[in-house]
Amino acid sequence: MKPAGPRKRAVDPLAHLVLTRYMEAHFEALLVTGYSADTVRARRISIRRFIVWCEERGIAQPADVTRAVLERYQRHLFYYRKPNGAPLTLGSQHGALAPLKTWFKWLARENHILYNPASELDLPKLPKHLPRAILSVQEVEAILAEADPATPYGLRDRAMLELLYSTGIRRMEVAGLALYDVDATRRLAFVRDGKGAKDRVVPVGVRALAWLDRYLLEARPQLIVAEREALFVTDYGEPVSPEYVASRVKRYMEFAGIQKPGATHLLRHAMATHMLEAGADVRVLQALLGHAQLNTTEIYTHVSIEHLRAIHDATHPARLQREDVLAADATDAARQALADALDRDEG
């Protein structure tokens, strides 16, 4: 048997195109200025899709791309249907077009084209979706209680779950925490290179710190096999990954019998919603969650339906009048008949 030779690198079928060369130059500039490889990877998918569309229509040079061309592409995305017949969501259309605006802005700034054809291109308006599910306080406590602190990995998981719920940090952020990023004395955690490559400081609750302290003293020394800076390590002593964090949360959700979609982000949503219900200002939540725009945080002002219903029942004049009617001096049968009639009227 012949020894296996070196693996051949796949040839990029778009490499010979002029548009591709300008795309790669753009991405190199983004990396130099501090954009993450993940951001570049996501934008490459969108711009390559546009380049393929251009090649099919004989559009070869950046200067050939006009506003009319971009609007044609926008209509193409709007009418495009996936293999299952479903259209692209507005979010997907926005995600496909936004990198093009950035790319052509760069091309114009670097004098590769005379003007920016995307400057007046209107992007689809992104809908503001409510989180699909919100955990109640009782459900969060049930999830936390499933981690068994009698075992090293269970104690690690309890500390990790408590930290997620206490701070609302993302799974990639908890995976990126180092030992020196938690200041127990000042009750703070330093989130480095969070979403958007931004650092921030978040407070950590007393209960979460107590579990972290137990983990560091009792569990982590049993899990590590070599010196590691990572705060949380796997059963084999390696730094946890974002996917590992999510899998642990999902595991304890299943143990607690909670079937709601999501994992780590559910704890983030729960933290924001529960704090808002308790009176936290939305701008405080914006800082805690690391949202660049306030309107991203304001979605949480709409999510607590049960809380809104309770307040409505307790304070709305019509509801109070109904209770007065039902409490009036009447027979039990008459009161029940009146209540049934009111319920039918409300329906």
UniProtKB/Swiss-Prot annotation:
Q: Where is the Core-binding (CB) domain?
A: 17-108
Q: Which GO terms describe its molecular function?
A: DNA binding
| Record localization | Cytoplasm
Q: Which GO terms describe its cellular component?
A: cytoplasm
**Which residues act catalytically here?**
170, 195, 265, 268, 291, 300
Keyword set, alphabetical order? Cell cycle, Cell division, Chromosome partition, Cytoplasm, DNA integration, DNA recombination, DNA-binding, Plasmid
Where is this chain primarily localised?
Answer: cytoplasm
PROSITE patterns cross-referenced by the UniProt entry: CB (PS51900), TYR_RECOMBINASE (PS51898)
Question: What is one process in the GO biological process aspect for this record?
Answer: cell division
InterPro entries named in the record: CB, DNA_brk_join_enz, Integrase-like_cat_sf, Integrase_catalytic, Integrase_recombinase_N, Integrase_SAM-like_N, Tyrosine_recombinase_XerCD
Q: Which SUPFAM superfamilies match?
A: DNA breaking-rejoining enzymes
Annotated Tyr recombinase domain residues? 125-313
**Membership in a protein family:** Belongs to the 'phage' integrase family.
Role this protein plays: Site-specific tyrosine recombinase, which acts by catalyzing the cutting and rejoining of the recombining DNA molecules.
Q: State what protein this is by name.
A: Tyrosine recombinase XerC 2
